[in-house]
Design a protein with these regions (language model features):
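Juxtamembrane regions of bacterial inner-membrane/periplasmic proteins
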Residues: 2-251
Length: 251
């Protein structure tokens, strides 16, 4: 048996291989798992809300805390009501006012987005181009504010609800969560507070007046309409007549 070789004390050490950067692969795995869990969780979340009433939204919570911090009444007026129990004028009014291509697009109105970009680029008053689907995605699943991350998530949730919910459910949720006045959300609550009747009894003019204040419900009032709101109401009512109820019958 050959004797073991003994390395001289002054012999140079053999070159050791540097350990592989395990931390990088670990970070990548964590990121991939996080993204996967988010995708799975978001799909489950959206699927559940296809069948369960949306009783509250992050935006409602924000409004409540704002009221508390300002010493005002923090009561939220919101009463979930199926769209089938509302006047047919209610869904038609928001489509006529907010998104007339709603039955046709897949969540995004690219032509309006381009026009809004050109308008804003010229330094004029900021104009939005969000569809009803985008507004629902933002109000139900996200926070308020402007950032690329939020816009990316908004686009993601918009596609999800278009695929999982469908148009009718999206419109139903919008009619229940849209801010329609001070601490007031949805058409049912607006009808009760401003017209002293259920949403099922709203006339065309009343539904159009609620829709007229949607872009800025804290600045304008459906109960005490300004001259602008009255003009806008008349415009929306005309658009509703032109579109006709049949326009949203097959969502």
């Amino acid at each position: 048996m050959a004797a073991n070789r003994i390395r001289p004390a002054n012999a140079p050490l053999s070159k050791q291989k540097s350990p592989a950067p395990h931390w990088r692969s670990k970070v990548v795995r964590i990121l991939l798992k996080t993204v996967l869990y988010f995708l799975i969780g978001s799909v489950i979340w959206v699927t559940v809300l296809k069948f369960v009433p949306v009783w509250f939204t992050p935006f409602m919570i924000v409004r409540k805390f704002e009221a508390i911090s300002e010493g005002r009444s923090s009561k939220i007026y919101s009463d979930w009501t199926p769209m089938s129990e509302m006047s047919k004028e209610a869904p038609l009014s928001v489509v006529a006012s907010e998104d007339q291509l709603f039955p046709q697009h897949w969540g995004f109105d690219f032509k309006s987005m381009v026009n809004a970009f050109k308008h804003n680029f010229r330094g004029k008053k900021i104009r939005g181009a969000s569809t009803i689907s985008q507004q629902v995605a933002k109000n139900v699943f996200l926070w308020q504010g402007r950032s690329y991350i939020r816009k990316a998530l908004e686009a993601y949730f918009t596609l999800l609800i278009e695929v999982i919910w469908g148009k009718e459910r999206i419109l139903e949720v919008y009619l229940n969560v849209a801010e329609t006045g001070n601490m007031t959300f949805g058409y049912e609550a607006a009808a009760q507070r401003f017209f002293y009747k259920p949403a099922a009894s709203l006339t065309r003019n009343e539904a159009a007046r609620i829709a007229a204040v949607l872009p800025s419900p804290l600045r304008f009032s459906a109960k005490n309409p300004s001259a602008y709101v009255q003009r806008r109401t008349a415009q929306i009512a005309r658009q509703m007549r032109m579109l006709g109820r049949v326009y949203i019958n097959n969502l």
